[in-house]
Amino acid sequence: MVATVVNVQVKNEEKIETAPKKVVFDTKNLNLWYGEDHALKDINLSIHENEVTAIIGPSGCGKSTYLKTLNRMVELVPIVRTTGVIEYRERNIFDKSYPVEELRTHVGMVFQKPNPFPKSIYENVAYGPKIHGISDKKTLDEIVEKSLRGAAIWDELKDRLHDNAYGLSGGQQQRLCIARCLAIEPDVILMDEPTSALDPISTLKVEELIQELKKDFSIVIVTHNMQQAARISDKTAFFLSGEVVEYTDTNKLFTTPSDKRTEDYITGRFG
């Protein structure tokens, strides 16, 4: 079975034998309901460190719900109920002894629409460290610079740190939000369609940034853009009707999918 998608080019990477990467998130038999709506069904998925894992699928398939389950943001919806286990570094995130604030320190999130605070660029990045008790100005200065450099936007903003973040372009705002996420030194970065509101040039900058960030972080990205998933991810999960249909190396999923439904989706027969 060979599937092709117009203008989708998967990464051509030489296979090098390496030691297995550690599992960051291990999802076991996860089910989730919004009231009576069974949104996630028997999800089993392992996400590895220092990789970009893409989640694709049609609207309403459960991909954003799954992403928001990884840092328990989904619990902000009062009618949510879950069964099963998600282990982060071998610890069940649903365990009552695991403070959600601690989990979200390790697992940062970048949303679909850039959402800077109505503050200066500096204060946007320093906000998280301040909340965690850091008040020394020199330390905060260092964190702000390191985070903006990590988000590949320091050179653009270093002379504008006290300007309001609302004055930035959409692409700059999104990279500022990534810098704000980096400032709390997470282990994992969740991204919910982070480029869907951006122009092509800004999208390219964010994609290049993601490739750099995976050297130090594990990244899980939800995207409707199959070309983007093919360009930037190491593994891809295809969700459909709340189920994981297929989860494998990105190159394999886009060239030789093992499930007919995957082939139908990536070749545009539905979606």
From Swiss-Prot:
Residues bound to ATP: G57, P58, S59, G60, C61, G62, K63, S64
Function according to Swiss-Prot or TrEMBL: Part of the ABC transporter complex PstSACB involved in phosphate import. Responsible for energy coupling to the transport system.
Keywords assigned by UniProt, alphabetized: ATP-binding, Cell membrane, Membrane, Nucleotide-binding, Phosphate transport, Translocase, Transport
Pfam families for the chain: ABC_tran (PF00005)
Top-rank taxon, per record: Bacteria
Membrane topology reported for the UniProt record: Peripheral membrane protein
SUPFAM superfamilies documented for this protein: P-loop containing nucleoside triphosphate hydrolases
Taxonomic source organism: Bacillus anthracis
Gene Ontology molecular function, alphabetical: ATP binding; ATP hydrolysis activity; ATPase-coupled phosphate ion transmembrane transporter activity
Sequence ranges assigned to domain ABC transporter in this UniProt record: 25-266
Protein's recorded name: Phosphate import ATP-binding protein PstB
